[in-house]
Curated annotation (Swiss-Prot):
InterPro entries (UniProt xref): Hist_DNA-bd, Histone-like_DNA-bd_CS, IHF-like_DNA-bd_dom_sf, IHF_alpha
Keyword terms of this UniProt record: DNA recombination, DNA-binding, Transcription, Transcription regulation, Translation regulation
Organism (species): Methylococcus capsulatus (strain ATCC 33009 / NCIMB 11132 / Bath)
Record has Oxidoreductase as a keyword: no
Assembly with partners or alone: Heterodimer of an alpha and a beta chain.
The protein, known as: Integration host factor subunit alpha
CDD domains reported in the protein's UniProt record: IHF_A
GO CC terms of this entry: cytosol
HAMAP family, per the entry: IHF_alpha
Length: 110
């Protein structure tokens, strides 16, 4: 199961003792700062976690999968995320039993 903003609010409430309104405001403001930075064309670098960057993609040819008709895919700007070294190391260090547990939680088999 994916971590949601509501889950983050609940963790801030239970682990840090913030009231739910303040915890929600903190989570919302955190994402708003990231969004505003990206909207202004600036990258976001979170030490120990990773980087959000903007990338411009050129127009390219595509194909309609139903009809096979060739159609242009327009140029656009996309957000990319690259995990930092610490985050990569933490994920790679997961033991096999932990991975199985995570898979079971994700599929609801726990």
């Amino acid at each position: 199961m994916a971590l949601t903003k509501a889950d983050m609010v609940e963790r801030l409430f239970s682990e840090l003792g913030l009231n739910k309104r303040d915890a929600k405001e903190l989570v919302d403001q955190f994402f708003e700062v990231i969004k505003a930075s990206l909207e202004s064309g600036r990258s976001v670098k979170l030490s120990g976690f990773g980087n959000f960057d903007l990338r411009d993609k050129r127009q390219r040819p595509g194909r309609n999968p139903k009809t096979g008709e060739e159609i242009p895919i327009t140029a656009r700007r996309v957000v990319t995320f690259k995990a930092g070294q610490k985050l990569k190391a933490t994920v790679e260090a997961l033991q096999e039993p932990e991975l199985g547990k995570l898979d079971a939680e994700r599929t609801g088999e726990v």
